[in-house]
Swiss-Prot record:
Family per similarity comment: Belongs to the universal ribosomal protein uL6 family.
The organism of origin for this protein: Synechococcus sp. (strain WH7803)
Keyword line: Ribonucleoprotein, Ribosomal protein, RNA-binding, rRNA-binding
Entries under Gene3D superfamilies matching the protein: Ribosomal protein L6, alpha-beta domain (3.90.930.12)
Protein name: Large ribosomal subunit protein uL6
GO terms, biological process: cytoplasmic translation
Subunit text: Part of the 50S ribosomal subunit.
Length: 179
């Protein structure tokens, strides 16, 4: 049995959870999330907690036990608090700006790169170099932040590019001069 899966998930105030078999719907102040969990687990609501249990002792069922518990916990936290990822743009002339729901990134290419925010995701830019991706779905926030970082990943020589806030870039020494 999974150590993570064993612990019940508390449901905070202002959050409602509805279960329909393996379909879980969570509504809260920040929005609503729906997800269908894979087979091999059962989800029950006991008082103000959600309990996830494996249906059998098969390996696949035990593997999915902790995963499903974490997915439901992330949904509950997402609709109550929300998630955000911060990115930093490093380099001369590199900047970002928001136009409506579109993030426009100038990262040293011959053209600016435009990214449309999917439903449930918002982009915010501070000082033209700090981008914040926020939303209720943890997976979607992480994927969008990774797509932005992939526009110009940080390079190891000067550290230019788009990196996560707090990310350490392993620096390399440049060419050594002629001897």
């Amino acid at each position: 049995m999974s150590r993570i899966g064993k612990s019940p998930i508390p449901i905070p105030d202002k959050v409602s959870v509805s279960l329909d078999g393996l379909a879980v719907t969570v509504k809260g102040p920040k929005g609503e999330l729906k997800r269908t969990l894979p087979d091999g687990v059962t989800v029950n609501q006991v008082d103000n907690t959600i309990v996830v249990a494996p249906t059998s002792e098969k390996r696949q069922s035990r593997e999915r036990h902790g995963l499903c518990r974490t997915l439901v916990a992330n949904m509950i936290e997402g609709v109550s608090k929300g998630y955000s990822k911060k990115l930093e743009i490093v380099g001369v002339g590199s900047r970002a700006q928001v136009k409506g729901k579109t993030l426009v990134v100038s990262a040293g290419y011959s053209h600016p790169v435009e990214m449309l925010a999917p439903e449930g995701i918002t982009f915010a830019v501070e000082n033209n170099t700090n981008v914040t991706v926020s939303g209720t779905d943890k997976e979607l926030v992480g994927n969008e932040a990774a797509k932005i970082r992939a526009i110009r990943p940080p390079e190891p020589y000067k550290g230019k590019g788009i990196k996560y806030a707090g990310e350490r870039i392993l620096r390399k020494a440049g060419k050594s001069g002629k001897k």
